[in-house]
Design a protein with these regions (language model features):
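Helical membrane-embedded segments and adjacent short helical loop/helix-boundary regions
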Residues: 12-29, 42-56, 164-180, 184-191, ...
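C-terminal ends of transmembrane helices
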Residues: 90-98, 123-126, 180-187, 225-236
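Membrane-embedded alpha-helical modules
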Residues: 133-217
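Helix-loop-helix junctions within the multi-pass membrane cores of secondary transporters/permeases
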Residues: 7-8, 78-171
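Helix-loop-helix hairpins and the membrane-proximal interhelical loops
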Residues: 2-54, 65-81, 235-236
Length: 236
């Protein structure tokens, strides 16, 4: 009974309800990642290990593409993946304010599961009015999302020889899912303005900044403008 109660803290109906939209996006994208890994020469076990250690869709796809090219060194792959995922620093620092009482062991486990989608879901749940969302439920979302990612990658690798996938369609799945996760924030005018500004800024910077640094820079600049605008509105 005690064990069941402990598990229920992390994996319950509320957590499942929060994470299922992520599953819908991760299944096709992870499957495509597994197919690509199979084409590069990775076994199902190696693909599963990579998905466990590199829980980042864009980072994993870029790493696989570089591995497939044959000319990239381990150092260049690691550094490129690190730069591409720098935005996770912003995500973790934002969520940290809701996890002030968590242990270092918890934070290490939680940080491994932060992605664009788990960040969006957890931040939305933490900021809901009269929310009872807590660190255990947030970790449950991360773990279940990560498990789905590993499963879909391994499955894609296993059947990679007999499946052909249109990567353009698959890549849009994640974009559509992320927009859906943030859709209920559209009632806040300032967030809409900042979001649109950030999008246009990212597009403008994409031609001059490599390795997706334009996303990090655009996010920081837009967030700064948003904070300044919010402070001005409050004072006014």
């Amino acid at each position: 009974l005690a064990g069941g109660a402990t598990i229920n803290r992390f994996f319950n109906q509320e957590v499942i309800k929060a994470v299922w939209p992520i599953w819908l996006g991760y299944l096709p994208l992870g499957f495509a990642g597994g197919v690509l890994a199979q084409k590069v020469g990775l076994t199902p076990g190696e693909t599963g290990l990579m998905s466990l250690l590199v829980f980042a869709g864009s980072g994993q796809f870029i790493a696989l593409a570089m591995m497939g090219g044959g000319a990239a060194s381990i150092t260049s792959i690691v550094m490129t993946t690190f730069i591409v995922n720098l935005r996770h620093l912003l995500y973790s620092s934002t969520l940290a304010s809701y996890l002030m009482e968590a242990s270092k062991k918890y934070l290490g486990t939680f940080a491994q599961g932060i992605t664009d989608e788990t960040f969006a879901v957890n931040l939305n749940k933490f900021t809901e009015k009269e929310s009872d969302w807590n660190a255990d439920k947030a970790l449950g979302v991360n773990v279940l999302a990560h498990a789905c990612w590993i499963f879909s990658n391994v499955l894609g690798n296993i059947v990679g020889n007999v499946v052909s996938i249109d990567m353009a369609v698959v890549s849009y799945t994640l974009t559509a899912m992320f927009i859906g996760l943030w859709s209920f924030h559209f009632e806040h005018k300032l967030l809409i303005i900042v979001g649109v500004f950030s999008g246009f800024l990212a597009l403008s910077l994409s031609s001059v900044l490599d390795h997706k640094l334009h996303i990090v820079v655009a996010t920081l600049l837009a967030a700064t403008v948003g904070c300044a605008a919010e402070s001005w509105c409050i004072k006014k």
